[in-house]
Amino acid sequence: MKRRVDKSERKFQAARHQQSSPTPRPKHVRASPQWSWAKIGLISLLILGATIPFLLHVFSDIDDLSRPSDLGLNHTINFYLKTEEGVRVGVWHTVPEHRWKEAQGKNVEWYEKALGDGSPIFIYLHGNTGNRSAPHRIGVANILSALGYHALVMDYRGFGDSTGEPTEPGLTTDAIYLYNWVKKRSGNSLVCVWGHSLGSGVTTNTAVKLLEQGEKFDGIILEGAFLSGRVAANQVFEHPFTWYYWKFPYIQFYLFNPMKNNNLDFPTDKNLEKIRTPIMILHSEDDHLVPMSVAQEIYRIAKKAQNSDERVKLVPFDGKHGYLHNGLYRDPALPNIVREFVQSLTA
């Protein structure tokens, strides 16, 4: 006997069958190959941007600093000075370019004696990252050599192959020691200093200490200078060109943690009030770390302290060239600017 099924039961069974039926899957939408590669490229760039500063910090000392000729510096010798007990600093001495043939194969004693040949001498004090092999530092040494000057580029304690830990008194001690070492061998030659970035703070610290000892540099060049270590970070974070860089996590570690962790102050602003040595300030208008307004303030302080328009000069470089913080050595006008400054020291 057949079971009778009424209409209401048929409707119920149909509804239950519909609920139990699997929902049809939507067709897979495949992303265009162009968009996939664009995403991969963008992610790769972000990773590189975040990690390159960190890698540079970690691997900045892998160069063989004992062989400056392999790094683009001919007629240059590498040597070491013991600035105090337990501290040995590495130094490169590049002689004037016109002596390059004579310098081939010579030892440290020959280079020391060469300091008394009457040519102007520059001590170069670099910034707070890397070592003396950085391209812009080699570039400055080559410019000075081409002008007929001696260039001595030192790695402070804790930098490059120098021993010890970097502290403000320690870096200043290293610079004072190098000055005294050069002065003993320089005869009547001019002895000037070129401080870049953090090196400007070491420069002014050293200049003040030398004044207390009755000594002084014959001329000072400050490039990309900070007013002081204690306000440098704030100045940089407020700079309109730096918004992009601070998106990457290692920038602060790479640039300012060395100053913060080692309590580096370097009161350039206060030091300038005491210095009476001729000063030339070099600054790029597009410096992405130190705004041009800092250079203008340094110029104002130094000019007021020395009460002279002739003994303090500010040389701005057009931002359209893209020199940023480290690239002034590429400007074709720089050698003549430096030459005129040195000539003014003996006028």
Over which residues does each language-model region extend?
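C-terminal catalytic histidine-bearing segment of alpha/beta-hydrolase fold enzymes
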Residues: 292, 296-299, 304-347
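Short beta-strand/loop motif that positions the catalytic acidic residue
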Residues: 274-275, 281-283, 287
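Membrane-embedded segments
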Residues: 84-181
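Hydrolase active-site cap/lid region
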Residues: 205-271, 327-330
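An N-terminal hydrophobic leader/cap segment in hydrolases
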Residues: 41-82, 87-108
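Gly/Ala-rich beta-loop-alpha elbow adjacent to hydrolase catalytic centers
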Residues: 195-199, 203
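Short, low-complexity, Lys/Arg-enriched N-terminal segments of secretory-pathway carbohydrate enzymes
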Residues: 1-32
